[in-house]
Each structure stands twice: as C-alpha cells, then as structure tokens.
A protein has these predicted regions:
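Phosphate-binding active sites in nucleotide-utilizing proteins
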Residues: 129
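Short aromatic-glycine-(Arg/Gly/Cys) micro-motifs in beta-strand/loop hairpins
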Residues: 8-24
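Conserved small/polar residues in nucleotide/adenosyl-binding loops
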Residues: 132-134
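A short, exposed loop/beta-hairpin motif centered on an aromatic-Gly-Thr core
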Residues: 25-35, 97
C-alpha cells in the first residue's frame, strides 16, 4: 500500500462554512473555513485509511469514483501520509514479550536500562522510521 497519497475532495460552501465530500472513500466532513475543512478532510481520510489497513482492506486509488461537482464547488487535492498519520494518532502502547540471556538481563538491570525504550529504538532503526517515544 502506498503510504503517501493525494485524494480529490470537493469543497461545497454552505451557511455554516464548508461541506467536504471525499468521493474515493464515500465519506464527508465539514469545517468553518477552507483551511479547517481541508484539515478535517485530511483527518477523515487518515482515519479511514488506517482503519482499512487494520482490516486488511486495500485503499481506493485516487480519482476512483465519479465526482459530483456543482457550480460554486471547489475541487482540490488533500495529501495524506498514512505512516505519519498513524504515528500521530495511533500511538497506544502494546505489550510484547521478548527473551534475552539471563546475564544480559542482570547487566541491563544494573545499568538501569529501559527495555521498552531499547526495543523501540532498535525496531525504529531497523525499519528506518523516526520515533515518537511513548
């Protein structure tokens, strides 16, 4: 799955600001200003995308659905980096069991090593990811 994608959105002015249709995901959101509406669209796409990823579903291709554009509407693209979005909003800690030699455990305990931090740093380094410590 591509992790950074730009999807078309349709901004429709209304009495309260802007209604935003996101055709590729069959969802909508809204915002008081154009900037807020676009940020809400990015958030909606991000949430939908990581939910789909968790459910092992494929993300829709950009422009995969017809757009219903009317006079006064604005069509633009909203980019979403799903990897960065997940790091920002889905940062809950999970327990993982690992096994190390006893002697290493003794030495690490003496040194006050934080096992969770070491494991996070090592995995991030191996995967080439920037890390947000939890």
């Amino acid at each position: 799955m591509a992790k950074k994608v730009a999807y078309p959105v349709i901004l429709k002015p209304d009495q309260e600001g802007y209604y935003v249709e996101i055709p590729d995901f069959d969802i909508a959101t809204e915002g008081d200003t154009i900037a807020e509406a676009m940020e809400m669209a990015r958030d909606a796409i991000g949430l939908m995308g990581i939910d789909m990823e968790d459910e092992k579903k494929s993300l829709p291709e950009p422009n995969s659905k017809a757009q219903n554009v009317e006079a006064g509407d604005t069509v633009t693209l909203v980019d979403v980096d799903f990897t960065e979005y997940r790091k920002r909003v889905d940062n809950k800690a999970v327990k993982k069991n690992c096994t190390i030699p006893y002697w290493m455990s003794v030495e690490a305990d003496k040194a006050g090593i934080n096992y969770s931090r070491v494991l996070q740093d090592a995995i991030s380094n191996i995967l080439g990811l920037s890390l947000i410590h939890i």
